Amino acid sequence: MQPMKKILIFAVLALVSLQAAAQVEYKASRFGIKSNGLIDNTTSIQKAVDWIAEQGGGTLVFNVGRYLTGSIQLRSGVNIRLNEGAVIVGAANIYAYKGQKGIFWGEGLENVTIFGKGVIDGQGPALKAFIAEQQKKGYVAADVPVPAILSFKDCKGIVLRTFIFRNPATPSLFVAENSEVVEDGCYTDTPL
């Protein structure tokens, strides 16, 4: 009976430890991510997402501020929390997206949640104007893909909860090709 009790206690402790690890939160500022809306945070945010994934998952927390970024590849088990007053601002420069279909994107992801009372602003009008200017100069193809705010392909367990979509560059707020995406309470304050 004693060995069985020890195994049961060990199993419970292991489960609690795994749950605690999955719920670890990391402030964006810890990774040098700037909230002034002027600095391009693409590299810093990507490094933060990658590092959190390497640690076994957790939540990257954005507090009050404006966080300018290009395209960010999400990782399984890494969540994004946008606190009230936090605004992720998509770059108004098509080159910042490196051909990707969204500000936040992923392929083959599992268990990712983007949530909070913050905003993801696609800067759609400015991005479309930049693309038109680059096309006029012959720098960008006429059929260049315009990024949505979010893009998922072949993903499972994606949850989008309570944040605001603003100024999308495309009619689709998010793209979900062959993906399981649950949208719960998100809304847009921008007419599509």
Identify the meaning behind each predicted range:
Residues 1-7:
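Positively charged n-region of N-terminal signal peptides that target proteins for export
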Residues 7-8, 68:
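Small/flexible residues
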Residues 9-10, 20:
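Cleavable N-terminal signal peptides
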Residues 13-14:
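Short, linear, compositionally biased motifs with a strong N-terminal bias
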Residues 21-192:
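Extracellular/periplasmic carbohydrate-active domains that bind, remodel
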